[in-house]
Amino acid sequence: MAQRNGMSPRPPPLGRGRGAGGPSGVGSSPPSSCVPMGAPSTAGTGASAAATTTPGHGVHRVEPRGPPGAPPSSGNNSNFWHGPERLLLSQIPVERQALTELEYQAMGAVWRAAFLANSTGRAMRKWSQRDAGTLLPLGRPYGFYARVTPRSQMNGVGATDLRQLSPRDAWIVLVATVVHEVDPAADPTVGDKAGHPEGLCAQDGLYLALGAGFRVFVYDLANNTLILAARDADEWFRHGAGEVVRLYRCNRLGVGTPRATLLPQPALRQTLLRAEEATALGRELRRRWAGTTVALQTPGRRLQPMVLLGAWQELAQYEPFASAPHPASLLTAVRRHLNQRLCCGWLALGAVLPARWLGCAAGPATGTAAGTTSPPAASGTETEAAGGDAPCAIAGAVGSAVPVPPQPYGAAGGGAICVPNADAHAVVGADAAAAAAPTVMVGSTAMAGPAASGTVPRAMLVVLLDELGAVFGYCPLDGHVYPLAAELSHFLRAGVLGALALGRESAPAAEAARRLLPELDREQWERPRWDALHLHPRAALWAREPHGQWEFMFREQRGDPINDPLAFRLSDARTLGLDLTTVMTERQSQLPEKYIGFYQIRKPPWLMEQPPPPSRQTKPDAATMPPPLSAQASVSYALRYDDESWRPLSTVDDHKAWLDLDESHWVLGDSRPDDIKQRRLLKATQRRGAEIDRPMPVVPEECYDQRFTTEGHQVIPLCASEPEDDDEDPTYDELPSRPPQKHKPPDKPPRLCKTGPGPPPLPPKQRHGSTDGKVSAPRQSEHHKRQTRPPRPPPPKFGDRTAAHLSQNMRDMYLDMCTSSGHRPRPPAPPRPKKCQTHAPHHVHH
């Protein structure tokens, strides 16, 4: 294939090699083998028009004949609602983060018209007016749609300028309203409209916005928060809106939405959801449910156990607190830090462990509880049905099974069993439905503590509940507190998703201080993704236009990033003529360098990991290099994939960190909501965006662990660490001792005067009102005489040539030069006579 402008060849055209059914993934329905039986066979989008050939490219293109999701002969909603694309996207398991190749093509086929119209803000507004009423899927989670709505029809938005929340974007246009399906059990008023587009819920106050480069945002009107859902079209088609925590808050979510956290007993469900205040909830948890393990479900990741805590000191049984020099002092310091951050009383709900600690047992120590099922011991590898991921009844299909590999647990060493949740998101349903749901009880005897196995489990997050009812998560990896959910029911649907997408919410200062939002990740808000290779400045020229980018994303045999992400990225780099290793190395060098704090004791050089000499260093390879992620994205990556060996690259910057000196101890139930908000806002104003000085249970490999007193204060060593870049020891010169001097009273500053002949000093002026004309001269002290300035040296002697002679010689030389050149110097002008000013005549008053 011929080269274009010295770059890599053009990708294969769309629609070739897929048979006679039309272009693959663009404007055509999926193959019949991928559509369940009973599904309608209508076209999924309005882009299935006759193919036209663009001059100069020779590429088989597809031009849409109408708005996406509807042919010219039908309404905007009916075709997609009953089409195969909706049925295909409804079978995405809740544990999966990315879409497969077929689901990716179905997602892009529906959004094709919006992508091609994303050139200017005016073009996007025209598109929203032309395709008003069209339903577009959000990919993940299933059951959520974007109903295209002009801005004039959005209630409460008004003249809101979203660029104030994202100054990097040149323009942001609100184009759609976010709606979702409704569960008839949770909302009986829906009735027969539960499976119809008219029965969708639009009461969340969420709107979809598009920016330049197809950056997708979700705007929360109630909280005035802008959430970055995707940085480009490729990320939007691959992941959808599944990382937006705000989507999972509504209690009216339908059956088709991803399932909620599976609780072992209906009684525990009632305890968590019907608690009126945190004090009563904490008392009930300590009395009845301490040590119980809950299989926590988070969208986009595997199930993981959460052990309910009976007391704060129980965290000493888990890493990284168990390996600290003094676990009790470290826990006291962390509790003091949480008091300063939350500014109110709080309750420790549980410790979230990695997924490998999730196992099955016969039940708690007292036996199998009611409402639970005990799987067989020798079950081996089990399969999981889609549960709440199945489409609604109108689709007439059931989700496929998803195999789950066996995982070790505790000392028994069985298989991790993921159980389908029949009631899906109906966490507020009846007790009978909750009791009938198949659940699994993971008892405290199986894996609640380190005594059940040879290794100590690591607490990835500590779930907290404050007086306002909000759920937070303390991350021992970096020592920060992150918001997880607005309430407990929201937490049971979203899990720890708030800690897996850090730095993607932008809000005003007051709102960010009230909700304790983390700092914005500038790497995500201001720069494109490192693996979005079609946006790289050295990419092929044909990939810089919308049609070229579309052909690149939906080319034949692009691959699937789920099974082999490295091969997927290598294929993209090879198509665009880029070197993946070079791209990763350049992006890694642009990240901020690490910082080792002054108060952090560094290990001696012989205990640190020294890099090999240059002669033994191998050439970096993309397969072995870590992804170039920012600090917040790196923490999210470690929490998502349970990287227990993760360590922070830097410590707290001592010169720029803000040290909170508040020693207040808050008790549950003693603070008003307004007082809590004012305390948080005051501290955020004093901090001014600086980094928080905090205890870090996990420290970098180059440092020792921190030391704390019994009151929770950090012990600062007398001999601090040396600078990181200094190879030589600093040397200091010994100063001679200063002899003792006799104390003298302070006197007036001396006046400097000349010594030697000179004009006599002027007599001092006579003071007003004095009768005596004689004034005595000021008396000079001995100290003043010693500090007198020495006389100036005489001017240098030039023999007979004095300054007057030199000036006369220079004047003569100037006149000679002027005479020899023929120009006579112009004589000076005579002085002008002063004009006599006439005075006005004096007025004589008679």
Swiss-Prot record:
GO terms for molecular function: protein serine/threonine kinase inhibitor activity. Pfam families: US22. Residues 832-846 have a biased composition (Basic residues). Keywords: Early protein, Host cytoplasm, Host nucleus, Host-virus interaction, Inhibition of host innate immune response by virus, Inhibition of host interferon signaling pathway by virus, Inhibition of host PKR by virus, Interferon antiviral system evasion, Transcription, Viral immunoevasion, Virion. Residues 1-82, 366-385, 606-626, 714-846 are annotated as: Disordered. GO terms for cellular component: host cell cytoplasm; host cell nucleus; virion component. Residues 16-25 have a biased composition (Gly residues). This is Protein IRS1. InterPro entries: US22-like. Disulfide bonds: none annotated. Belongs to the herpesviridae US22 family. Residues 26-56 have a biased composition (Low complexity). GO terms for biological process: bidirectional double-stranded viral DNA replication; symbiont-mediated suppression of host innate immune response; symbiont-mediated suppression of host PKR/eIFalpha signaling; symbiont-mediated suppression of host type I interferon-mediated signaling pathway. It is found in: Virion; Host cytoplasm; Host nucleus. Interacts (via N-terminus) with the viral DNA polymerase accessory subunit UL44. Interacts (via C-terminus) with host EIF2AK2/PKR. Inhibits the establishment of the antiviral state in the infected cell. Prevents the phosphorylation of the host eukaryotic translation initiation factor eIF-2alpha and thus the shutoff of viral and cellular protein synthesis by directly interacting with EIF2AK2/PKR. May also participate in viral DNA replication by interacting with the DNA polymerase accessory protein and the lytic origin of replication, oriLyt. Residues 722-732 have a biased composition (Acidic residues).
